[in-house]
Structures are given as C-alpha cells and as structure tokens.
Amino acid sequence: MRKILILTGRYLPGHKDGGPLRTIINITEALGNDYEFYIVCLDRDHGDTKSYPYIEYERWNIVGKAKVWYVKPGGFSYDLIKKVSSGKDLIYTCGFYESYGYKTLILNQLGKLQGIPVIVAAMGTFSEGALSHKPLKKKLFINVCKVFGLFKKVKWSVTSELELEDVKKNIGENAECIIAEDIPRTSVPGIDFNKIAEGKLHFCPEFALQKIC
C-alpha cells in the first residue's frame, strides 16, 4: 500500500479552517482503504492558544483512517520534515506560504527528500482575489521562490481549469498541473462535526488521490 504524507496547518479535531480541512478529511476517508495517509499538522486550531486535549507528541495518533503527527507552533523544522518524509511514496503539501510548505520545497530543490514526488495544492492561492490581499508581499515571495527554482520539481494540484490557468499565469506555462476535483463529503467514524463546531466533542486519538498518485 502506497504511503502518502500530507503537510497542512490543521487537522482534526480542529474545525476552523473550513474548506481546506474538509478536503483533506474527504481524501483520507474516501481513499484510506487504498492508501496509507500520514498527516503532519499543528497541535491546535486556528487562533487557539491551547493545544488539543489528549493528543500525544512524537508519535503517530490514529485519527479516522489517517495517522496524525501533531506539531507545536514553530515545530515544522527541516529535520522534522525529512524525518516524517522518510519511507513515503508521495508528499502533498497544502500550499507553500507556511513554513511546512516552503521548507518542503527547499528540501526538495536541494535533493534532501530522497526523490519523493512533491505535490503542492494550489488551494486558490493564485486567484485574483487571493493575490489582492497583501499583494506586494505575496508577489515578492512567489518571485523569490521562482528565482531559486523551488517550483521546478513539483506538480500542482488544482480543482478546475480556471485554477490551472491561474497557476500557469503566475508560475509559468511549464507548470505541471493535475486537475483533481473535490471528493464528495464523507464522515469520520466517531466524529460528529456539529459537536466539533459547538466545542462539545472530546477528542481521543483512539477513535477510530487516486488522480494525484
């Protein structure tokens, strides 16, 4: 069974990231019987100062059909990314602005990821609306990444032809893109998402991509 590493800001039991979080849940629950999913994310929800209760550090927590490694703020180091990438068949990073994203691109460019294919989820990053927010900072960051060749050895995951055009417009016509439409909403055994949103769910680690691959 192929092993897929997903690097993202937040995962269950978090709920504040909305669409991006829901997408990862749908992928892991829909394809979890065909692939082994390993997710590395922060140990707390967006804007929270406290970590999730009952999680364990420095080990994989079983969450639904995925194994999740929780990281404290500032914990996405180069060494950690290399460590969790070892033995994986594919690395899927949710964007590139965050430290886990650009550090993965740097390691990939330097040949430190053992040749493991890297997929970057565009996640609307290059839409006109997204780029209009802090435009100078974002364009500078994108251009620096391009100058150092950080986008040359990756593939982009997009959800539509329009997003594909946005990527090529900002990265270049040679950007290799894969159109993978969103997977239908799925449920995770033992999790009531309404209770998560209401802050009533007590999380316990024991509850228990085809196009991209």
Regions found by a protein language model. Name each.
Residues L162, D182-I183:
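Carbohydrate-associated surface elements
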Residues L12-P13, S99, V118-L136, T186-S187:
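A short, histidine- and acid-enriched strand-loop-helix "catalytic/donor-clamping" loop
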Residues D45, E98, L162-L164:
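Alpha-helix capping/helix-boundary segments
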Residues K3-L7, I179-D182, V188, N194-C213:
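Conserved donor-binding/catalytic core segment of Leloir-type glycosyltransferases
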Residues I81-T104, Q114-I119:
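Short N-terminal targeting/anchoring amphipathic segment
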Residues M1-I55, W60, S86, K152:
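N-terminal subdomain of nucleotide-sugar transferases
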Residues K138-S157:
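Membrane-proximal helix-turn-helix segments that form the acceptor-binding/catalytic region
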Residues I4, L90, I106-E128, K155-S157:
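Active-site proximal beta-strand in glycosyltransferases
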